[in-house]
């Protein structure tokens, strides 16, 4: 029993995070030097994301009986994303107004270091609906894979899957090759995941070593408020959605606990994307649904980031005594409904969108971003964890709505009545290429 515990990724990552925190706290200079370990692990994951998405989406779509089902899945997913992310934005707005973590700070924006946020403000200017939509279309297929742009790869994979489906039996050979390639890719993922404890250790040691636990104290009220809000959102909102769908949010969290720990260590929900694709299929969701919902959710369904954006914006207003009446807050909400949809699931992207939102609203001092620049890294863990759980729940919900969910398998896996294989298995749904 003890041997199996020590060998489990869950235990190894948890131990690595604890050691990283201790190293960063007692030997901050050494801890800060551990950054390459975390960066290397995240880069290895990013290396594999594009081919994973391509294989999963292509085999999922090409193996479907009807192309109408793909369109229905996409429409249902986008509707769900819009509803739930809007709820997340509103909850963040309500709680930050009730708790008022920035009240009484009386910060003069003129005294803040505007240069510290100049880089984020410059990147924020490039954000926009048209620019975002145009960026979804890759300049070249190779460029999409080389840059690792999730939405660009997803677009090409969807088109490729449609075209392969139309070939019918003539495309069987191509389908089999991609299916076999998918198995190889997931084999690589299993190898990379053995390095997860090292990556989590390096990232956590760097965070504590560079920023220090002391930086949490001054703005601790905002951090605590944000973490509690994320927990409430997961337990109450996502928990209610899960219960209505027919499963327990707590059992689901236990099922993806290893992925959550990887995200906790790296502060990026993207680091768990490949494993989530595999695990959601093993949970009973059809491969075509998983392939569409998970990658798309990384830009359109980031619940934790949505909560963070409203809370951070209003916090800056409270701290700098910038009055925000109901009209200003509704305007903020509307702007965030648009700007938050272009967020990628990588560390730092939420801060860039926050800068874009504050610039667009015009009522808040952009220099106020300097207030939370130092603690943004500590809040990114809660953002990433909430994003991951939110996308997992979304996949199950959408799969049920479009009737592509194996309820018995879902119940068996979450209740440990069926063994969860260690290696990736190609879904039986994708074994039938329609003529």
UniProtKB/Swiss-Prot annotation:
Spans through the membrane: 4-24, 44-64, 76-96, 142-162, 184-204, 222-242, 289-309, 326-346, 352-372
The organism of origin for this protein: Salmonella paratyphi A (strain AKU_12601)
GO terms of biological process kind: L-aspartate transmembrane transport
Localisation: Cell inner membrane
Family under the similarity heading: Belongs to the dicarboxylate/amino acid:cation symporter (DAACS) (TC 2.A.23) family.
GO CC, alphabetical: plasma membrane
Protein name: C4-dicarboxylate transport protein
Pfam family membership, one: SDF
Membrane topology category: Multi-pass membrane protein
A GO MF term: fumarate transmembrane transporter activity
Keyword annotations of the record: Cell inner membrane, Cell membrane, Membrane, Symport, Transmembrane, Transmembrane helix, Transport
Job description of the protein: Responsible for the transport of dicarboxylates such as succinate, fumarate, and malate from the periplasm across the membrane.
Source taxon at top rank: Bacteria
